[in-house]
């Protein structure tokens, strides 16, 4: 599991993206990097710009460097734009789609739901957050877990994302279930990232 020892709000501010709902409030009050010199402007080298973008992508999916490299290697073998393929690879992770569906509030919570054995795919328990969901796969909360308070909140829409549910998902929160209808399109994926900079970072 990726190292999450650094406070998530501070990490969010350092990367310039809100990784949790709580971080959104901090952005409104403190729209600058953490630390007493956070308000000052800094000139970043091309390398640092690419590194930051890579870290932003990693953080939004809560993956390790090794996991991101593997996803990049798979994406590089596909036709089309490598950067878009990379984001799509990450979006097909089980924990990412549990988050998108509204069953979980954050990527961290989604990961824990999977690791603790609360999620099944096509009727089989899956406890690996990195499991790659395929089109037509049906994902749902296991029967034995549905009465837990956390999932009662999810069933009532308490964790539903702002705006529309991504069109590549068919979600039934009352049933705590969703289906991946098709492969996501990069433009539909709610991730803040200039993926071309990530490609340039790894291609250097």
UniProtKB/Swiss-Prot annotation:
One annotated GO molecular function? rRNA binding
Output the Gene3D superfamilies linked to this UniProt entry: Ribosomal Protein S4 Delta 41, Chain A, domain 1, RNA-binding S4 domain
Entry GO CC:
small ribosomal subunit
Entry's InterPro entries? Ribosomal_uS4 (IPR022801), Ribosomal_uS4_bac-type (IPR005709), Ribosomal_uS4_CS (IPR018079), Ribosomal_uS4_N (IPR001912), S4_RNA-bd (IPR002942), S4_RNA-bd_sf (IPR036986)
* Ranges for domain S4 RNA-binding: 92-157
Q: Does the keyword DNA-binding apply?
A: no
Q: Which GO terms describe its biological process?
A: ribosomal small subunit biogenesis; translation
| Record bears the keyword Ribosomal protein | yes
Q: Give the PROSITE patterns listed for this entry.
A: RIBOSOMAL_S4, S4
Q: What SUPFAM superfamilies does the database record attribute to this sequence? A: Alpha-L RNA-binding motif
**What are the entry keywords?**
Ribonucleoprotein, Ribosomal protein, RNA-binding, rRNA-binding
Summary of subunit composition and partner proteins: Part of the 30S ribosomal subunit. Contacts protein S5. The interaction surface between S4 and S5 is involved in control of translational fidelity.
The record ties this protein, via HAMAP family, to: Ribosomal_uS4_B
UniProt xrefs under PANTHER family: 30S 40S RIBOSOMAL PROTEIN, SMALL RIBOSOMAL SUBUNIT PROTEIN US4M
Tell me the function of this protein: One of the primary rRNA binding proteins, it binds directly to 16S rRNA where it nucleates assembly of the body of the 30S subunit. With S5 and S12 plays an important role in translational accuracy.
Q: Which family does it belong to?
A: Belongs to the universal ribosomal protein uS4 family.
Q: What is this protein called?
A: Small ribosomal subunit protein uS4
């Amino acid at each position: 599991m990726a190292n999450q020892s650094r406070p998530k709000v501070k990490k969010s501010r350092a990367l310039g993206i809100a990784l949790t709902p709580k971080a959104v409030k901090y952005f409104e009050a403190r729209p600058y990097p953490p630390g007493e010199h956070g308000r000052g402007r800094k000139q970043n080298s091309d390398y640092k710009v690419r590194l930051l973008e890579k870290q932003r992508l990693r953080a939004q999916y809560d993956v390790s460097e090794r996991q991101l490299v593997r996803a990049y290697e798979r994406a590089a073998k596909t036709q089309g734009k490598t950067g878009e393929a990379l984001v799509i690879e990450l979006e097909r992770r089980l924990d990412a789609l549990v988050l998108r569906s509204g069953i979980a509030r954050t990527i961290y919570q989604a990961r824990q739901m999977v690791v603790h054995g609360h999620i099944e795919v096509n009727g089989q328990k899956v406890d690996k957050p990195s499991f790659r969901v395929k089109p037509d796969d049906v994902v749902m909360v296991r029967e034995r877990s549905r009465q837990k308070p956390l999932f009662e909140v999810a069933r009532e829409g308490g964790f539903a994302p702002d705006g529309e549910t991504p069109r590549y998902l068919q979600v039934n929160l009352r049933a705590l279930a969703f289906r991946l209808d098709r492969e996501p399109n990069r433009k539909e994926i709610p991730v803040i990232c200039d993926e071309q900079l990530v490609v340039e970072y790894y291609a250097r």
